[in-house]
A protein has these predicted regions:
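N-terminal intrinsically disordered/low-complexity leader segments
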Residues: 1-7, 161-163
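Helix-turn-helix
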Residues: 11, 15-57
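Solvent-exposed, amphipathic alpha-helical segments
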Residues: 11, 15-23, 68-73, 101-109, ...
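Amphipathic alpha-helical interaction segments
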Residues: 11, 53, 81, 85, ...
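Hydrophobic alpha-helical connector segments
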Residues: 57, 68-99, 125
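Short, basic, alpha-helical segments at the C-terminal edge of helix-turn-helix-like DNA-binding modules
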Residues: 60-66
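Helix-loop "lid/cap" segments that line or gate small-molecule binding pockets
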Residues: 88-93, 100-114
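Hydrophobic/aromatic-rich alpha-helical bundle segments in the mid-to-C-terminal region
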Residues: 113-163
Length: 163
């Protein structure tokens, strides 16, 4: 009976995501992914056929995971507790490299963000979260980034509460 390739494929994808988290798009090579996955480069190509395909799969994984984690955090509590949870998730993503990978992939056009905007309020929420992610990933002092985060959410609440 042939061996199930699913775990190997998943391991390679996880290694690709980790490679992007550590080095961004600049550090993404098939050799680096293979080393991190503990396989030979040929096996990476066997499962994904090209660097581009693997990169697109990793970009989709990062975008989906990032979005789900931020939505979970925002929905974890009402009011400011949900915003605080979202802030902590943004900090976590800045620390684990997810923000760096997401910024790098978005800048390269590998993550399509146009479909997610359902209206002004949704677009404004995404802009707040994404802007703060960029600030954290680029080294803006934590207190300054948090002040901006709080001010932007308060402004959005004020604007959307007006008749």
């Amino acid at each position: 009976m042939p061996k199930d390739a699913t775990p190997t494929r998943a391991n390679i994808l996880a290694a690709a995501v980790q490679t992007l988290q550590r080095g961004g798009l600049e550090g993404f090579t098939l050799d680096a992914v293979a080393r991190r996955a503990g396989v030979v480069k040929g096996l990476v190509l066997y499962h994904y056929a090209s660097r581009g395909r693997l990169l697109r799969a990793a970009a989709a994984q990062i975008a989906t995971s990032r979005s789900a984690a931020l939505q979970r955090a925002l929905g974890s509590a009402s009011g400011t507790a949900g915003l605080d949870a979202c802030w902590e998730e943004l900090r976590h993503q800045a620390e684990d490299g997810t923000a760096r990978a997401w910024i790098s992939l978005s800048s390269a056009g590998l993550i399509d963000r146009s479909a997610g905007n359902g209206g002004f309020e949704d677009a404004a929420r995404e802009a707040i979260v994404d802007g703060c992610a960029v600030a954290l990933a680029t080294g803006v002092p934590l207190a300054d980034a948090r002040d901006a985060y709080d001010a932007l959410w308060l402004t959005l609440l004020e604007v959307t509460a007006q008749p």
